[in-house]
């Protein structure tokens, strides 16, 4: 390269002349007059520079150069002097954008753009004002201005709204076909409002969705499958459609919440303790929508608060059902047949009942919840029926060239897992084909409305059905109930629904029911309008007489007039009682939470109380026996198991009846009163208190006063406590017999003592008068029966206190007691108490009468029989007391006078109280004060002067098996002083 650059320039023959070079360069130029000459001279005078990457500086034909470098040099030389068009386009676009801003658009240009937010405002305003373009434009502008005042939204005018209205309708009107009798504004409103609702629910609209727009317009509701979810779309109950249907506008100012807060609290102490025993909060709060069924609400809480026995029963039933042989299912050749039914798990718990809170105001609902939230009453079919059109839009055939989803082939069973729930249902809701006659149109429409109704429709079926029952009762000429009610202002729908749904047994048997229930049952069997439950099969007669169909409008108008004349502002007492009684799973029917909220709810809250109903003992026993026999595993087939269960039930019938009678007797013997009603002389008063569920407080007070002033025969020296202890013994004995009958049969001859269950009051016997309206944290007062035992005076035999054996004191607690009627209790002592019983007979024979000796011999015979049960005896007999004391003393020093001197008179406080002269005055003044202070103050009046040093007077009157240690210390001190003196 250096050698070539240092060579002298080539000869002039090879070097091109400057003019030719300048001419060759200036050939592509458009003009070479002035500027071209200058350019030529400048190019010729400029020294040639070496270009980077070039091989030679001159265009020598003999020198070979790279094609890439030459091409690059040519590109540099032929570079255009003007900028490319891509660099000039942005300036033009910016100029155009600057000229046309949304605020400077002309109204008549026809190129108005609508954003998504503006479209949403358009459809909202359309639902409110209908085909009033000026009002719609004002509503859109107000919403856009409220949304953001500084935004660049173009405020719409009346003409722009009209243009968008007709453009949108023109795009979607091809999917819906209307009757010729239907006016054009009604067609436009029904199409646009339903399209706006579908657009609001679905994010993207496809051709498949537009195919269902017709069904939404005709029937008022559809279900669309989108992104794996079933989305339910209903025709909105807006003001525009209500005004078009000429419906009552009284519901426009009423705003119900979409969800309400339900507060549940226990109705009594039994329900409170039942839930608290499960370690759960008895007070609950749940937020549910208005269309929530009451029966599912009850089932939720029943499952949540089921008892431990029910849980164990369910686990046991599941275990036994899984262990049953499945041979019967293998014998079925048909795959479509269902498997053999497993043993159903019977509920051991009583049914749960929900009732309104006491004191809440129950008023007649001023609106029909069905008319408020229902979309069927304002659909196109209902509008055409209300207007009396002869040809319905729904009966018209599909347009030519349109693909209809109903005419498509159903999917096969191979993809059954991927099928949507909509395809699994029968396709009876599709529009009829072209060859369907027009006369069958109304019948087909009714069928479609019935099968498309769902359980989530806020009980619209039952309320429309019950609302039309009143019309049928007032106007017997109307043979059938219309499919849709025109008088939506019926204020008795919810009340009648609550009333008639309480007694399903009477509805099933009209012979035992009143006229209204009989009419409800008869109309239910022949009705074609609405089914009370979504699972009701549509197999009844759907044909309605044409005469009744023609008179439907007149009957409704007459019913509305009669209702206006017979308007009752308040509910009857019978309906109030039924509502106050509450609802269980059996009589909840199709009532929803919205129905209850309309009747006695307020401020988006609904207060309910719950309790468990009492179950008949015979019914519960029979169900438990059948359940046990059914669940018992066996190797036979299902039919054999059923037969064995029936035979076992027949065999155990007698034993179950006996057990039921015993349990009923025990339940009647135990009452919910904190005292023994047997102590009262007035039988009528006791019967009134024990039989009434919520008794009067005055009866309780009178009964307490009667107990303190009663006069009856004394059976023993400790007369005021024996009867109550005998009642406790009777309850404990019956409980022990029931426990032993249940499963302690093999331990009759054993020497082990069976631990007994503590004697408790059953939960059902808690005083129902006490409610939980004002619960505080103070302790609940309990009526405790204290067993008091009096020690003998020391003057009898000059016997010290320490000789009294504690073992012998407690041994008397397990001795049988002597009953008033001559029979003894079933409590049997152990083998260790046999010497005490024999000594008891020996010592008691010295000073007892022959009658008492016979009773003691009978007790000794009973004591020799050893049993597996050992009843805790709460009573202490006279003979037992004598035996306990005499067994610890020297037998040589025992005589009759010493034994009799122990209990010369009863030293109980009540005995001293009755013997005093001021007994009547103290009872009158302190009838409600049974405190220890008042009792001791009364005793001080009897004997105010007592010597403290006297050992006999130092013993406490109400000492509880205790030892006077102060007197003992005095004796020890005196003994030590005597020893020091000696």
UniProtKB/Swiss-Prot annotation:
Comp. bias (Low complexity): 21-30, 822-833
Consequence of substituting residue 527 to T: In strain: k2
Compositional bias (Polar residues): 100-111
Gene Ontology biological process terms in this record: pattern specification process; regulation of DNA-templated transcription; segment specification
SANT domain: residues covered: 109-173
Biased composition (Basic and acidic residues): 86-98, 410-425
Cysteine-cysteine disulfides: none
UniProt modified residues of type Phosphoserine: 431, 437
Protein's cellular compartments: Nucleus
GO MF assignments: chromatin binding; DNA binding
Xref: Gene3D superfamilies: Homeodomain-like
Phenotype upon changing residue 842 to T: In strain: Berkeley, k1, k2, k3, k5, k8, k9, k11, pe1, pe4, pe45, pe5, wi4, wi7, wi10, wi13, wi18 and wi19
Tissue: Ubiquitously expressed throughout embryonic development. High expression is detected in CNS and gonads.
Listed result of changing residue 823 to I: In strain: Berkeley, k9, wi10 and wi19
One Gene Ontology term, aspect cellular component: nucleus
Top-level taxon in the UniProt lineage: Eukaryota
Sequence segments annotated as region (Disordered): 1-37, 71-111, 323-349, 407-456, 822-851
Function of the molecule: Polycomb group (Pc-G) genes are needed to maintain expression patterns of the homeotic selector genes of the Antennapedia (Antp-C) and Bithorax (Bx-C) complexes, and hence for the maintenance of segmental determination. Can act as a modifier of position effect variegation (PEV).
Family the UniProt entry places it in: Belongs to the cramped family.
Name of this chain's protein: Protein cramped
Protein source organism: Drosophila melanogaster (Fruit fly)
Species classification: Eukaryota, Metazoa, Ecdysozoa, Arthropoda, Hexapoda
